[in-house]
């Protein structure tokens, strides 16, 4: 299992229901020269289904565990769901996805000052292969504990959503059902209900003793090896255009061009080994980007497949870098 992380905070302890989320894609401009006001004024239409994919509902009852094999995602041409190059409609859909949660940031407001021009310029850069990520913002959040966060510029976040919209549906369909977080329909409620169902199943509805092992991966995001992740991405993304964009995002080093926002004194509260600025160039993903969350699930699918297929653990669930295994025998755990 080619992961460089070590497991921490493991402990074995005795102990005596899913709504699919639709894609955020919306209808966009078919004419690049359409008026910005008409684009901004339209309401969000119904979700567009992606050709070659299907929406599924995962039952919360987990008396049986679905085990999936790791298979490469279909390319854009093979699935007929993507274009050989980014279309302007795809870019506008990604813009609306990004705007949903970032519309009031300074970077978003600046981008929307000349929205049509900026979208066209960004599209031209992507088609020509001239796109390069810009400056990032570094700041610290203090709850629940001090953590260094890196925020990409709004235009770069649009590109993250563009890549995600094109390649994520097929890849996420190959992930096990027990991989939670950063996947549509698999948030905290999904994870909690699935874990409860597993406990009920393994304990025969609380009638048998049950043990659990809880662990997490130390310093997960800053310890991700980009070289390993790159190989995993190359196995999953077969369409050259999208793989090149994924590589550009992956190997972009935000430490080369960033500014610190907020109280700089808070940086001292973050342990040095948990800071991205203190890692080797080929280690670490910036916490705060959609691309990092998506890449992390691909990275840890190796762990999921190992636990399911090699260890053959029936009752297992993972939420980002935290995972739980259930068994009736503490020795087995």
Where do the language-model regions lie?
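Non-catalytic, polymerase-adjacent accessory regions of viral genome-replication enzymes
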Residues: 1-120
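Active-site-proximal segment of RNA-dependent polymerases
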Residues: 78-81, 164-225
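Extended, charge-enriched "interface" segments that sit outside catalytic cores
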Residues: 135
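Conserved, non-catalytic sequence blocks in retroelement Pol enzymes and Pol-derived host proteins
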Residues: 111, 183-184, 288, 292
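Glycine-/proline-rich flexible loop or hinge segments
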Residues: 96-109, 139-150, 174-178
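Conserved polymerase palm-domain catalytic core
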Residues: 118, 126, 198, 202-320, ...
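Conserved pre-motif C helix in the palm subdomain of viral-like polymerases
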Residues: 146-176, 279-308
């Amino acid at each position: 299992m080619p992961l460089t992380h070590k497991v921490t905070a493991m402990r074995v302890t005795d102990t005596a229901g899913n709504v699919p989320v639709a894609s955020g894609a919306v209808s966009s401009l078919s004419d690049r020269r359409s008026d910005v006001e008409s684009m901004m004024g339209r309401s969000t239409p119904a979700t567009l289904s992606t050709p070659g994919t299907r929406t599924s509902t995962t039952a919360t009852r987990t008396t049986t565990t679905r085990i999936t094999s790791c298979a490469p995602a279909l390319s854009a041409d093979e699935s007929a769901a993507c274009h050989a190059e980014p279309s302007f409609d795809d870019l506008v859909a990604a813009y609306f996805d990004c705007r949903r949660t970032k519309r009031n940031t300074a970077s978003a407001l600046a981008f929307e000052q000349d929205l049509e021009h900026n979208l066209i310029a960004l599209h031209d850069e992507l088609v020509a292969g001239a796109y390069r990520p810009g400056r990032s913002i570094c700041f610290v959040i203090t709850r629940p504990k001090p953590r260094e966060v890196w925020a990409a510029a709004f235009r770069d976040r649009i590109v993250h959503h563009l890549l995600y919209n094109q390649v994520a549906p097929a890849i996420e369909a190959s992930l096990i059902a027990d991989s939670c977080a950063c996947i549509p329909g698999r948030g905290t409620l999904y994870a909690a209900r699935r874990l409860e169902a597993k406990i009920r199943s393994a304990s025969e509805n609380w009638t048998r003793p049950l043990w659990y092992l809880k662990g997490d991966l130390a310093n997960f995001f800053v310890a991700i090896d980009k070289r390993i992740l790159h190989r995993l991405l190359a196995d999953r993304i077969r369409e050259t255009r999208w793989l090149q964009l994924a590589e550009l995002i992956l190997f972009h080093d935000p430490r080369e061009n960033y500014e610190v926002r907020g109280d700089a004194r808070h940086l001292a509260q973050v342990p040095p080994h948990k800071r991205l600025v203190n890692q080797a160039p080929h280690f670490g993903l910036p916490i705060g980007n959609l691309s990092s969350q998506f890449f992390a699930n691909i990275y840890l699918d190796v762990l999921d497949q190992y636990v399911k297929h090699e260890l053959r653990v029936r009752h297992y669930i993972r939420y980002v870098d935290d995972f739980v295994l259930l068994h009736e025998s503490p020795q087995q755990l």
